[in-house]
Amino acid sequence: MALRPARCYRTTERRSYTRKEYVRAVPQPKVVHYVMGNSSVEFPVEVQLISKSDILIRHNALESSRIAGNKYILRECGRTGYLFNIRVYPHEILRENKMAAGAGADRISDGMRLSFGKAVGTAAKVKKGQEIITIGVNPEKFYAAKEALRRCSMKLPTACKIVVTKGQDLIRD
């Protein structure tokens, strides 16, 4: 069955659902790596991608964002010239009450009886002003980090802003 659109799970009004011991099978998050690049070096410039609204970000959106940003920053800075860090983890469990469609579906379907749903994925609950991704680089690669975060934000379901949190005085305009 196809993946339900993200707009079905985007809002954060509903209560959190994170207790894995009550759920039979929770799908593993698609995010493979949370820290990429050179983690042994302290970089002088740090740039962050910050959410502008409260939202749930699905694990596949986080993974596609990670791939897009990491691919660009790796090409620009090399393997040891950056630190890419995803700051959120998809704890929220997303459920779906699957409905049969087509001819004769009314005989097969249970409708809204036992409509709790099965776990179909996970999502990260992000608040307004929370950091989603952080990139650390040297001052000469600041614009590459900024472009990588812009590419990351294109894959996420919320408006984001890019903020320099460390090393503002080292950046030349």
UniProtKB/Swiss-Prot annotation:
GO molecular function: structural constituent of ribosome
Example of a GO biological process term: translation
Keyword Repressor among record annotations: no
Cross-referenced PROSITE patterns: RIBOSOMAL_L10E (PS01257)
Protein's name according to its UniProt entry: Large ribosomal subunit protein uL16
GO cellular component: ribonucleoprotein complex; ribosome
SUPFAM superfamilies assigned: Ribosomal protein L16p/L10e
Family that this chain belongs to: Belongs to the universal ribosomal protein uL16 family.
The entry's keywords: Ribonucleoprotein, Ribosomal protein
